[in-house]
């Protein structure tokens, strides 16, 4: 089974507030949009929050009442994205593969998620890392086969899983998409 892990434990320093709660044009929040996009196509969605986000977790549970969505408060969230991802992979190690979403990238299209899932299924025996690209520029979400979970759990700092991707270029399956959502993140209120 492929599950989603949504990394939502960052500090939003550049945004000037909690960008996860910022509203998009349609009134839905950034994180809620990302959760719905993942939950629509994946059987299991784990949302990784900051360690002190217990109240926000309860708020999300009330807003997003979906049986395939669960939440995890990363004990190492203050140490950076790699630590939160490592904690999440450990917590969700029963998966065959994990599709890693970034909470601040709510514009990824459903067709893109389907294309990535199809590419993983077509290459599953090769234990791929499936990565979307727009005009050759790599983006998110990225699917990692379970064979990479141990390496992901050893990551440190704030670079995410980039070192794992860099170490396994021969395993990369790049899917060119016409979806700027895979490279468009929200760093400032102007990005909404």
Would you name each region that the model predicts?
Residues 1-54:
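N-terminal glycine-rich phosphate-binding loop and ensuing alpha1 helix
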Residues 1, 150, 154-192:
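Conserved alpha/beta core of the MobA/IspD/sugar-nucleotide pyrophosphorylase nucleotidyltransferase superfamily
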Residues 10, 104, 188:
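Active-site glycine-centered loops adjacent to acidic/histidine catalytic or metal-binding residues
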Residues 15-25, 29, 51, 72-83, ...:
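Residues at secondary-structure transition points
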Residues 31-97, 110-111:
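Conserved N-terminal catalytic core of the sugar/cofactor nucleotidyltransferase
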Residues 1-3, 65, 122-125, 189-192:
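SAM-dependent methyltransferases
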